[in-house]
């Protein structure tokens, strides 16, 4: 452990002692982490907000499987009208925690608990919308002046027809061949 790294996700331990006693037993859980300073350039999680998972852990032979829905509050600017917009992104998760985790695939199971902090942190980052809209049909600040369907300014500069002719479909067929003469 290097420890103390800036931006390290907070720990959020979930005890799995009870369910580990009987294969297949389940337990409802609602772990959460409080985040500060999480966000992308245009969208972020408001400081102090909680990322909450509502789900359950189930005992399996390799360890435990965690399933549920992660709720991620966010705020940003509408990409069309630039008004402030807020929302809650919801992401389904299904993750396996085991004593011998596979790098990049499963998470560590430590004795009698799992740490879901890193999962909540990573899931929240991926859940943030890249281009938020205040509403699906937001028309922008002045729809008459800036229609969302762009008309090219270059339409009247045409100097003859220089568009490529349609490609002979026989050439396309040849693209897939390996022209190895042996
Ligand atoms: Zn808008």
Question: Could you tell me what each predicted segment is?
Answer:
Residues 39-42, 60-62, 79-80, 90-91, ...:
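Short secondary-structure boundary micro-motifs
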Residues 45, 59, 71-73, 82-88, ...:
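Mature extracytoplasmic or otherwise solvent-exposed domains
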Residues 1-75:
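A positional/architectural concept
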